[in-house]
Structure formats: structure tokens, C-alpha cells
Amino acid sequence: MVTTYLLFIVAYLLGSIPFALVVGKIGYGIDIREHGSGNLGGTNTFRTLGKKAGFTVTIADILKGTLATSLPMIFGLDIHPLWFGLAAVLGHVYPIFAKFRGGKAVATSAGVLLCYSPVVFAILAVVFFTLLFTTRYVSLSSMVTAVVAVIASIVSGDKIFIIAMCLLAGMVIYKHRANIGRIINKTEPKANFSKKQK
């Protein structure tokens, strides 16, 4: 039982690692919280620091979700891995290492899915990028993909999967509430795929 509690803490701490902040400060000498949207996630990193930093942060945020979700398998615990994934996402959104001001749960949630259901992860990746290249709204693509994740979990019939996806989708949509207003008002920034970035 003690091991279980410790691993939940480890999962939260993994999620709390603010890779956007680390990359910004070490690689570029800036605090990304003071630039762009101020969000500690991949999208703000792409827009503020460029493609190289953006890809680095996004991949790192995905992998911390994957690693956290795999903890019970690594240590042979008979506990559903999605609970550890949820702990990592909570850490990503409310990181203890960055004054509880983190990202919007998208990349780390993707990492959780990558570990738990690679097939669903692949389907959602197609949905996300199709929406992104069609609408050019990262936020809208993220929210719609989160809803599709809930639908996929319902189809699976896995009760814990359904609960986890509902919680993650709720978190993603809640963290994008300001984006929803900007989309309605047509002031939400669009992804610019032709713009030259670092």
C-alpha cells in the first residue's frame, strides 16, 4: 500500500515537471509564462520559441504521461494504470514545481492514451491533425478530440476508461474556457503553418 501511495506521488511529480519552463529558461533564457498566452504547454512554446522548442516540449509532455501510466506495470501493482495517468495530468495542469500554474492537459493526456490504448491514441491523432489542418485552431481541435476520446471510451465498454476519459475531457475543456470565448468572438489565434519559425 505504501508503494502504491508513493507511486501516485511519483506520477504527480512526473506530470509536474514544467518542460516548457525548463526549455525556455535553459535554451532561450526566458520565462515562457511571461510570453504569449503564459501557458506552460506545447502550443505556447511553438508560438513563442519556435518549432524546435515546441516539438521538444510537446514530446516531453506526452512521454511523462506515458511513463506515469506505465508505473503500475513496471512495479507489478494490481491497480488500474489510468489512475496514475490521471495523477500525471493533474500534475501537468497544477504543477508543484511551477506554483501550480501549468498546461492545458492535452499532450500529457495523449501520453496516457499512448500507454493505455495505442489504437485509440492513433485514431485520436488522426482526428486532431485533420481538424487542425482544416480549422487551424489548436484549441478547437484539442477540445473536439477530447470529446471523441470520451465516445471511444464508451464504445470500449471499459468503465474505468470511460471515467478517466470523462475526467480528462472535462479538464481539457475547462482549461480551454477562455479559448472558447475567443473562438466565438473570432479572436482566437490560428496556427500558421507557412510561417518560418526557429
UniProtKB/Swiss-Prot annotation:
Cellular compartments annotated: Cell membrane
Protein topology in the membrane: Multi-pass membrane protein
Known catalytic reactions: an acyl phosphate + sn-glycerol 3-phosphate = a 1-acyl-sn-glycero-3-phosphate + phosphate
Transmembrane segments annotated in the record for this chain: 4-24, 71-91, 113-133, 147-167
Keyword Cell wall biogenesis/degradation among UniProt keywords: no
Record's keyword terms, sorted: Cell membrane, Lipid biosynthesis, Lipid metabolism, Membrane, Phospholipid biosynthesis, Phospholipid metabolism, Transferase, Transmembrane, Transmembrane helix
One MF term in the entry's GO annotations: acyl-phosphate glycerol-3-phosphate acyltransferase activity
Pathway(s) this gene product operates in, as recorded in its UniProt entry: Lipid metabolism; phospholipid metabolism
Keyword NADP: no
GO cellular component: plasma membrane
SMART domains according to UniProt: G3P_acyltransf
Primary localization: membrane
Swiss-Prot/TrEMBL GO biological process terms: phospholipid biosynthetic process
EC number, UniProt record: 2.3.1.275
Domain of life: Bacteria
UniProt function note: Catalyzes the transfer of an acyl group from acyl-phosphate (acyl-PO(4)) to glycerol-3-phosphate (G3P) to form lysophosphatidic acid (LPA). This enzyme utilizes acyl-phosphate as fatty acyl donor, but not acyl-CoA or acyl-ACP.
Subunit field text: Probably interacts with PlsX.
Family statement: Belongs to the PlsY family.
Protein name in the entry: Glycerol-3-phosphate acyltransferase 2
